Amino acid sequence: MDKDRPGLPAPDDNIEEVPSTSGVQERASEGDWENVLIEISDSSSEEEAEDAHLDSSQRGKKRKRVDDDAGGSAPAQHVPPPQLDHPGREAILYRFPLDLRRFIQAIGAAATVSFPMAQVCDVCFCPSHNKVSDLLPLVSAPRHASHRPVFRI
């Protein structure tokens, strides 16, 4: 059974160096693939120098980095929402985009042809009507003085 398994790689007399752009070098020793020596360059010496001159009471606390070029930082400005032409209508369309959009379109159609508001509600929220174009037959239908609105719930 041991003959079927592949053996360890042949020992290599050369030390393998892997070039790195971050200043970290890795070297693998002779045939030992588990132990890797990592040398880290002193790129973080600036942070270590800052930590060295701090008092013991300041160590471990978070500090804000200060940009020497900037004289001071202005507080973040609150940007108000854009002003809308019709704030009430646009707010309703934004919050309720499906059924109320059709309802508002029907109200606009009702304002131009002046038929009872109850018919607009009936057309918009009745399951058999799906489009605002369903209002057109109601607009062309004559209105009677004895007409009473019927609300379906």
From Swiss-Prot:
Region annotation Disordered: where it falls in the sequence: 1-88
Protein name: Uncharacterized protein BLRF3
Naturally occurring in which organism (per UniProt): Epstein-Barr virus (strain P3HR-1)
